[in-house]
Amino acid sequence: LLKEKPDTIYLYKKDDKNYLQITVKEKVYDTVEAIFNENKHEYGKYSLNNKFIYVKEKTDNLMIDEYSIEDVNMNKLARGIFDKKDNIRVSSNNEMTDGYGILKPQGNRIIYTNPSSEDGKEVDATTAVTNAINFLELGYNEDVSYQVTTALEGITILQQTYKDSIVFSKDGSAEIIVEDNTNGIYRLTSPRRISKAYLSSKPLGTYDIERIEYVINYLYKHVELQSVDDIVLGYEKSYNKTKNTCSYVPMWYIKYNDRYVSFKSLKEAVDKGERL
């Protein structure tokens, strides 16, 4: 894994002259290598429009996993994100406010808004991501992992992660959208329900997911390759209202024109002659 195994490592922080010196024992490298070998995955390397994309090729033994779900604790969330924690009021339609920010359930999502922060100037993408993560740490820590998938001026989108991959959903219940400016976060959309306890798994059918070679060939023939930025073997998260559960179904996703769309949806649109 590592060609060189130095016994001293120096850690530097950007724009800081100070550093941390760490003495490393030889067995630490053995431990790191063992963990790496246990968790590594094989990726295929494909060229699309003169850029390389690395994709998990193995689609055998994929499972559809089912979990119980529960609602996010709105009271706990409000106490975490509101500034005026002693002045939180709840309306008849479950809308919560501290006199500045507003927190309310809406369908499968929770919407936070702060009207007093709407008139600021846009911030750059790096600042937007930093602000988003700092705000989420105040109360959006329900043991669900997310990663940033879109970073633009004033807007950050984070997708839920599952089994080392990205989760998507048609109703937005697997993503967090943060909008901010120089006055702070003024709107944040997050899932209302989260998966809790593992219930069961069943094998994915042989023909329920395409081979990566088929996906690549289809893209070459039918779409503008310069608009394709990524291909991931992700999961579609869907709810069963009758059983009050959610399922994670393996599925190919294409990042096309800066947004992720399932390969099935992309193919359906192309086959119908619809504009992507």
Where are these regions (language model features)?
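Preferential activation on post-signal-peptide N-terminal prodomains/segments
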Residues: 1-138
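Short acidic-glycine loop/turn motifs at beta-strand connectors
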Residues: 14-16, 25, 106, 179-183, ...
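Helix N-terminus capping/helix-initiation residues
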Residues: 27-28, 73, 164, 211, ...
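Short, low-complexity, polar/charged sequence segments that are solvent-exposed and flexible
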Residues: 30, 176-178, 273
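Short, non-transmembrane alpha-helical segments in secretory-pathway proteins
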Residues: 74, 115-154, 199-241
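Exposed beta-strand-loop-beta-strand "reactive/processing" segments of non-cytosolic proteins
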Residues: 80-101, 108, 136-185, 231-260
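Hydrophilic extracytoplasmic domains
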Residues: 182-276
